[in-house]
UniProtKB/Swiss-Prot annotation:
EC numbers on record: 2.4.1.-
Family per similarity comment: Belongs to the glycosyltransferase GT106 family.
GO biological process, one term: cell wall pectin biosynthetic process
Species for this entry: Arabidopsis thaliana (Mouse-ear cress)
Gene Ontology MF terms: glycosyltransferase activity
Ranges of compositional bias, category Low complexity: 7-20
Coiled-coil region(s): none
Pfam family, one: O-FucT
Annotated residues for binding of substrate: 336-338
UniProt protein name: Protein PECTIC ARABINOGALACTAN SYNTHESIS-RELATED
Tissue-wise expression: Widely expressed with the highest expression in reproductive tissues and roots.
């Protein structure tokens, strides 16, 4: 009956607040039974103040009823509420962890299709350097371990000797040397100092020791690969190594995997004890090679391969003169202008010119590349397609318009690294009119200073390489090993220096639009190139190791 009366009493006060009703009943009704052992007291026997329950909001009682004293709450509801608290706690921890991770995440641009998305930065854009906050997340980590213990076996205990001809120009040879060290490491072979093969175009007979510091090269890699200066004395017929098919591995595919060398080349080296690899242009891949081998290639490229001291010193002088041409220290831009006759011909692209120029270029192409030329009837459509795809070299005038749209003023000091430009001064006129301060190494140094370096074409190329490498802004106009190695080295040095890679495909559309105004063109150029400046980005699959060494060769700072 008491329980029935309790219910009736609650019902009669239904119009009042539940909390107030409960409080009133506790104080006035003689029929209310106290279910706690101490009646209206707390667990320690002291009277419980009614405001304790009133201070808790309604949502608290509904979500966490087991904190209250309501006997009507079932054990099942208590379990559900406990589970809810546990889920909320885990979600909170995950959220906090995600926020901390986001705050500590290194700056890294990521590609979504053809669009490169980069994290937002607070700094105002600068024409001369990348934002500081975008360049502090990564550091080089391919240098050799100081005080490390070498696990290399003695020279007579390696699997044999490997020998390569480094073909092409200076930069192609540089890549071949890096790959040769990596291949020797993969096969645990001794590397014979690579021979720089005479280039058919440059007719240069430079030896390794004429351009690179051999002692530093061998010493820096002494814990990685066994390197000897010459073919061992016990191998008497040295001419055989240069010409004999029996001593040459010729079937190495381009961008071969490390496993290919272990399965196909190593057995022949073990059998013959000394083998030449030929040809050796781009004969080692990137993403099919262990990370430690890719890191070794960076070690060779950025640390072991140093130019001779006299080349380094002359380059430093050119850089200093370039910065101080106006009497005050100023930043300078380096422009790799690839518009030589050979490059224009090989591209099979169509360029502005007179009818006579076009006829002569057609004759030149037919002579140099007869199989590709055929009868010439298909070349026009091919040229249009290549231009749309961004596969044609930028003309000097096009480069000038792009740089002006990016905001570089007329007074900009520009170092030009280039061979003889196809079309001569007439072709260079638009660029020189917009940027009159165009400078070459011949303008910065006297004839006597360059005499020593003229003995070897590769020495002159090395000077261009170093002056471009140390510039505040580097601009490429077409692909190639020179630009690729420059951009990669500047990234490895910290991403701070801008390395601009024009989007030639998009620019061809803008140049070909007769209705596009200057303001719209400027906006297109700025938006397109704001992330094409050598910012941190994963190496694979968008880049090879030489243009972007981040993934295998750089660590979080």
């Amino acid at each position: 009956m008491a329980e029935l009366r309790h219910s009736s009493s609650l019902g009669s006060r239904s119009s009042s607040s539940p909390l107030r009703a409960a409080g009133d009943e506790d104080s006035s009704s003689p029929h209310v039974h106290d279910h706690s052992p101490n009646g209206g007291d707390d667990e320690d026997g002291r009277p419980r103040h009614p405001s304790r329950d009133r201070d808790r909001p309604i949502w608290f009682h509904s979500l966490f009823p087991f904190f209250g004293d309501d006997p009507r709450v079932s054990p099942q509801k208590n379990k559900i509420s406990l589970l809810l608290i546990l889920i909320l706690a885990i979600a909170s921890l995950i959220s906090v962890y995600g926020i901390i991770n986001h705050l500590n995440a290194p700056y890294l641009c990521k590609k979504d299709g053809i669009v490169l998305n980069c994290p937002h930065v607070k700094e105002s854009p600068s024409p001369w350097e990348n934002p500081l906050s975008a360049t502090t997340s990564w550091k080089p980590c391919a240098e050799r371990r100081i005080g490390g213990i070498s696990d290399l076996p003695p020279e007579n205990e390696t699997n044999g000797y490997v020998f390569i001809h480094a073909e092409g120009g200076l930069n192609q040879q540089r890549i071949a040397i890096c790959n040769a060290v990596a291949v020797a490491k993969i096969m645990n072979a001794t590397l014979i100092l690579p021979v720089l093969k005479q280039d058919q175009i440059w007719k240069d007979t430079t030896k390794f020791e004429d351009i690179f510091d051999v002692d530093h090269f061998i010493d820096y890699l002494k814990d990685d690969v066994r390197i000897v200066r010459d073919i061992p004395d016990w191998f008497t017929d040295k001419a055989e190594l240069f010409s004999s098919i029996r001593r040459t591995v010729k079937n190495i595919p381009k961008y071969a995997a490390a496993q290919f060398y272990i399965d196909n080349v190593l057995p022949r080296i073990k059998e013959k004890k000394i083998m030449a690899l030929k040809p050796f242009v781009d004969r080692l891949g990137y993403d099919n090679v262990p990370q430690e081998i890719n890191r070794l290639r960076c070690r060779v490229n950025y640390h072991a391969l140093k130019f001779l001291p006299e080349i380094e010193q002359m380059a430093d002088s050119l850089v200093s003169r370039m910065r101080n041409r106006t009497g005050n220290p100023n930043p300078y831009m380096a422009l790799h202008l690839r518009f030589e006759k050979g490059m224009v011909g090989l591209s099979f692209c169509d360029f502005v010119g007179t009818r006579e120029e076009k006829v002569k270029m057609a004759e030149y192409r037919q002579k140099e590349w007869p199989r590709r030329f055929k009868n010439g009837s298909h070349l026009w459509q091919l040229a249009l397609q290549k231009r749309k795809e961004g596969r044609c070299p930028l003309e000097p005038g096009e480069v000038a318009v792009i740089l002006r749209a990016m905001g570089y003023p007329k007074e900009t000091q520009i170092y030009v690294a280039s061979g003889q430009v196809y079309g001569g001064q007439n072709r260079m006129a638009p660029l020189r009119n917009m940027f009159p301060n165009l400078v070459t190494k011949e303008d910065l140094a006297g004839k006597e200073e360059l005499t020593t370096f003229r003995k070897h074409v590769t020495s002159l190329a090395a000077l261009d390489f170093l002056v471009c490498l140390k510039s505040d802004v580097f601009v490429m106009t077409h692909g190639g090993n020179f630009a690729k190695l420059i951009i990669g080295a500047r990234r490895y040095m910290g991403h701070r220096q801008k390395s601009i890679k024009p989007d030639k495909g998009l620019m061809s559309k803008s140049f070909g639009d007769p209705y596009m105004g200057w303001a719209t063109f400027v906006e297109d150029v700025v938006v397109t190139h704001q992330t094409r400046t050598g910012l941190p980005e994963e190496t694979f699959p968008n880049y090879d190791l030489w243009e972007n060494p981040l993934t295998p060769c750089m660590c979080k700072a």
